[in-house]
Design a protein with these regions (language model features):
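Flexible, Gly/Pro-enriched loop and linker segments at secondary-structure and domain junctions
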Residues: 4-37, 57, 140-173, 214-216
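Gly/Ser/Thr-rich phosphate-binding loops and adjoining beta-strand/alpha-helix segments
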Residues: 5-9, 26-59, 75-89, 168, ...
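Acyl activation and transfer enzymes in specialized metabolism, enriched
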Residues: 45-70, 180-199
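Small-residue-rich loop/turn and linker elements
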Residues: 74-106, 132-135, 218-225
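Plant-skewed but cross-kingdom recognition/interaction modules and surfaces
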Residues: 96, 123-128, 132-135, 171, ...
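Helical lid/core segments from catalytic subdomains that handle acyl or acyl-like groups
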Residues: 97-153
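Intrinsically disordered, low-complexity linker/assembly segments
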Residues: 154-191, 196-204
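Flexible helix-coil linker/hinge segments at domain or subdomain boundaries
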Residues: 205-225
Length: 232
């Protein structure tokens, strides 16, 4: 097990939490997870990566990570029997090794793409030359995001390390006719369709205007959505 860097979070007061009843209800489900798959225009993202001579994979990965961090509900977990909300999420992504296996790589969040790529690139390069292996970390302050570049799929059900896991799982597929499918698994105890839709809206914004991924996020630019999008 790899010990991840210390993550900062706040404890949610469930006594006054507007979501308390929904949280309690969905936590009783045998499996409270739900999956979505949304086609998203990505031609501009591809062309931007090509023009700037950066990794299309890394640019898409960062856009997904930035969108996930922009929706508070995707940062909420249970820790020591308390509901918490992490300040920031990292991303764990599989990288193909020489033997066509894969090794998981941990990539920390960053305020803009250049910093993200500078930290992620050496890890990705090193992973390609190592033996296949999973990555088990202590903590849940991350999302899982995988690229499936060989398929342009229309649906996907993600594997779960534990039934009803709170860590969101994302997969994006092959660019076809300017569109990429982005599938996501979310825990209904924290995330409703509304919150998932806000996540996808942020993904669309990043894919449609990728130049913004080089601009550091400020508090006012945390989300392009109305203030209600940031309600707890």
């Amino acid at each position: 097990m790899q010990e991840a860097a210390m993550a900062h979070y706040r404890i949610i007061d469930t006594a006054s939490w507007p979501r308390r009843d929904h949280f309690t209800f969905y936590r009783q489900f045998a499996n409270p997870s739900f999956n979505l798959c949304v086609p998203i225009a990505a031609q501009r993202l591809y062309e931007c990566a090509k023009d700037r001579r950066v990794s299309f994979f890394q640019l898409a990965l960062y856009a997904l990570l930035r969108a996930a961090n922009g929706v508070p509900q995707l940062r909420q977990r249970v820790r020591n029997d308390e509901v918490i909300e992490y300040d920031s999420l990292a991303v764990m992504t599989p990288v193909m090794t020489v033997g066509e296996g894969f090794r998981q790589v941990w990539c920390d969040n960053a305020p803009e793409f250049t910093a993200f790529s500078a930290a992620a690139t050496p890890k990705i390069v090193a992973a390609r030359e190592t033996s296949p292996a999973p990555l088990i970390v202590d903590g849940e302050h991350f999302i899982c995001a995988s690229c499936l570049p060989w398929l342009h799929f229309t649906s996907m059900t993600h594997a779960e390390y534990a039934v009803g896991a709170a860590v969101p799982a994302l997969t994006w597929g092959k660019l076809q006719n300017g569109v990429i499918p982005v599938a996501g698994r979310f825990n209904h105890a924290f995330v409703d369709g509304l919150h998932a839709s806000r996540f996808y809206a942020l993904v669309e914004e990043g894919f449609n205007d990728p130049e913004r991924l080089w601009l550091p996020l400020t508090e006012t630019a945390l989300s392009l959505l109305p203030p209600a999008a940031r309600e707890r």
